[in-house]
Amino acid sequence: MKQICSILLFFLISAGSYAQNFADYFQNKTLRVDYIFTGNNKQQAIYLDELSQLPSWAGREHHLSELPLEGNGQIIVRDLATRQCIYKTSFSSLFQEWLSTDEAKETAKGFENTFLLPYPKQPAEVEIVLFSPRKKVMTSFKHIVRPDDILIHKRGTSHVTPHRYILQSGNEKECIDVAIPVSYTHLTLPTT
């Protein structure tokens, strides 16, 4: 019994020591990556459109290199120096659904896709992969993100849409604020 407890304790300590620390690899900012998925049902391609920096990160900070859900696409962020996976997420896109239509057999189209990733502290490689319904890789694309790149647009600090909190349950690290539009104008909203 003592031996089983020792082995179990060893595995628990080992699992905890492997956990990534968000602050080791990422800043409290968001990297917005805009891609264009193009093609038809026979051939697909991914193109990088634009990179933007947003003022804060509101996503997960734990289990960063694990997939939260299975999708028909993945984004993998690797530290450029060590090649270690530092962030991974999955998605499903309208482009991949469109590929199963009759229109995709006859014509090629492009679909815009935007993804929000944690902003890396050091240069990182971002890989995006599209899978078929049978989980075969259809196409993939890799690019390097250098956090100090002057071509990364800084957004979200000016020209911010006017807003006010009706209820603020806590800070953004612990709470999610949900806004439900109901077609009010600034003239019909009560002022307090």
Which ranges hold each PLM region?
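Sec-dependent N-terminal signal peptides
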Residues: 4-13
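Sterically constrained small-residue positions within well-ordered secondary structures
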Residues: 10, 24, 66, 106, ...
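Sec/Tat signal peptide C-region and signal peptidase I cleavage site
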Residues: 15-19
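N-terminal prosegments of processed precursors
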Residues: 20-113
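Short, flexible beta-strand-to-coil junctions
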Residues: 80-81, 131-133, 186
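Non-catalytic propeptide/linker segments at domain boundaries
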Residues: 115-182
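Conserved small/polar residues in nucleotide/adenosyl-binding loops
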Residues: 185-191
